[in-house]
Amino acid sequence: MIVLGIESTCDETAAALVEDGRHLLSNVISTSVKEQALYGGVVPEIASRRHCEFISATVKKALLDTGKTMDDVDAVAVTFAPGLIGAVLVGVNFAKGLAYSANKPLVPVHHLRGHIAALYLTHPELKPPFLCLVASGGHSHIVEVQDYTHYHILGHTVDDAAGEAFDKVARTLGLPYPGGPSVAAAAKTGDPKAYRLPVPHVEGKYNVSFSGLKTAVLNEVNKAQMKGEAVNVPDLAASFQERIAGILAEKLLLAAADTGAKQVCLAGGVAANGRLRQLVNDGAQKLGAKVYLPELKFCGDNGAMIAAQGYYQYIAGHTAGLELNGLPTLPIDYE
C-alpha cells in the first residue's frame, strides 16, 4: 500500500511516498528556514505564504521522483494538528482537494505521531510497545507507544519545549536560527562544566521544565556584559547543551527503569542532538534496553513520517472527509 504524506505544520513544506509504512519511495522538503533565520525564528505569516507557493510543486516532485502518479497512490495522509494554524491549513486544504479529485481516502495524522513513525523508516524491525521521548521545537513528551495508534503520556514539559529552549538560547548567544544545530556546533569547542546551570525541579516524576534554564543562560550573558566582559559562547553553549540533554535523558531513562521498557526511542528535531543520543544510548545499555534512534534526515519535519503513520492510521480505520479541519493544539493521546 502506497501512502502520500503531506506535512506543513511549521517552516517545512514536505511530501513523500512510503510503502506499507516502512519503505521510503521518495522524500521531498521545501523550506523557508533561510528566510525565517533573517528574523531569528519562524514568522507564521511567512511560513503560511511559502507553503502556498511550495506545496503543489513539492507534492508533484514526490510523485515524479518515483515515476508514479496519483493512480498508484492508495491514500493521502496529511498533518492536521498540532502546529501553526495558518501553516497547517495550507496542507490540510491541499490534501483535501487532492484526495477528492483523485478519489483517494484522506487520512488525518497527528504531527507527533508522525515523528514517532519516522523510527519505522530507520528501523523496520521496530514494533510497539516501546518508550519514546518526542522532543521538538514545540513539544517535549515521554510517551508509552502502546500500539500504532494508541499512546500514553508519562511526562511532558510544563513550560518551554526543548527545541524552543535551544532556539531562544541560540538567539541570546548571538547564534543563528535554527538554534539546535547552532548550539551543538558551538558546544563542540566548549567546556560543558564551565558554567553551573540549574537543574529545574518540577511536579511530576517525568515532567521537565526549561524556562528557568533559558533564563539562567540569559543571566550569565547579562552578568558578563555588566562587567564589560565577553561571554564565552562555546563554554556557555556546551554547558547549556549538557544540562538540557542530561535532563531529557535522565527523565526518559527513569521512565524506562520504572516501566521496565525494553525498547527506548528518540524522535523529533531535538533527537538529532549528538549529546542527547549519546547519553540515552549509554544509559539504556546499562538498563539492558535496546535503543532506537531516527536517521538524522528523519528527525526534522518531513512528509515521510506522515506517510508512515498515515499507513497505520488508515489500516486502523481512521479516515476523514472534506469536513477535516486543522487544529493548533491536540494531545498525542487523543481518541
Task: Describe the residue ranges of each PLM region.
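A contiguous, well-structured pocket-lining segment that forms one wall/lid of small-molecule binding clefts
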Residues: T69, A185-V264, N273-L287, Y314-G317, ...
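Conserved phosphate-binding catalytic cores of ATP/NTP-utilizing and phosphoryl-transfer enzymes
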Residues: V109-L131, Q309
